[in-house]
Curated annotation (Swiss-Prot):
Name of the protein: Probable GH family 25 lysozyme 4
Location in the cell: Secreted
SUPFAM superfamilies per UniProt: (Trans)glycosidases
Biological process terms in GO annotation: cell wall macromolecule catabolic process; defense response to bacterium; killing of cells of another organism; peptidoglycan catabolic process; signal transduction
Catalytic activity: Hydrolysis of (1->4)-beta-linkages between N-acetylmuramic acid and N-acetyl-D-glucosamine residues in a peptidoglycan and between N-acetyl-D-glucosamine residues in chitodextrins
Length: 213
């Protein structure tokens, strides 16, 4: 029994030690910005790659390169869909092919599912989401979903098809923990938590994120 308790204690401490803090960013950022964020203790960055206007973010390639040059080990990008553009199968490939053209070094593409720009028809929203997934899969992207219960349910209703992909959820309670998480959309376990917004210590705006390893 004592060995078992020691093992559990070790796992708990090891998990805490190996948790990661990071940022998500929606504006151009320099090497100095990322070096500052590393000095603040952040270890990963998720950078906007596609805007809700239906265009690739012109800053994404440079920001990814600057993050890598600064020494950020884990760099992803996120895609903010444009529902009114009506071309879900094309949006993911537009981003991925753009990044590939510049040999951008990144990991995942997170679909940002939020805002009031979606249709009031949940069936149409689900079809659009599935089009986004299909487009990203056609170019071999590693896909994740950013959302929250308060955003997902009004947009997608009871749809659970997104739950096969990792979940990055938002709850600005300021706590680096998944203890607040309640299942929704078919997800029972999240991958990343966005736990606060409003960071600006390094001259660039960012949100605070966390995940255990």
């Amino acid at each position: 029994m004592r060995l078992f308790l020691l093992l559990i204690t070790f796992i708990a401490l090891f998990g805490a030690i190996n948790a990661f803090s990071g940022v998500d960013i929606s504006q151009g950022s320099s090497v100095g910005d990322f070096q500052c964020m590393l000095n603040q203790g952040f270890e990963f960055a998720i950078i906007r790659g596609y805007m809700e206007t239906g265009q690739v973010d012109p800053e994404v390639v440079n920001s990814i390169a600057c993050a890598r040059e600064a020494g950020v080990e884990y760099v992803d990008t996120y895609l903010f869909p444009c529902f009114n553009c009506g071309n879900p199968q094309d949006q993911g490939p537009a981003l991925v092919n753009y990044l590939s053209g510049y040999n951008a070094n990144y990991g995942m593409v997170w679909l940002d599912i939020e805002s009031s720009d979606w249709s009031g028809d949940q069936s149409a929203n689900v079809a659009f989401f599935e089009g986004l997934i299909s487009g990203l899969q056609s170019v071999g992207a590693h896909i994740g979903v950013y959302t929250s219960a308060s955003q997902w349910i009004p947009i997608m209703g009871g749809y659970t098809g997104g739950s096969e992909f990792p979940l990055w959820y938002a709850n600005w309670d300021g706590v680096q923990s998944f203890d607040d998480f309640s299942a929704f959309g078919g997800w029972s376990t999240p991958a990343i938590k966005q736990y606060n917004d409003g960071g600006s210590n390094c001259g660039v705006g960012y949100d605070f994120n966390w995940y255990p390893n």
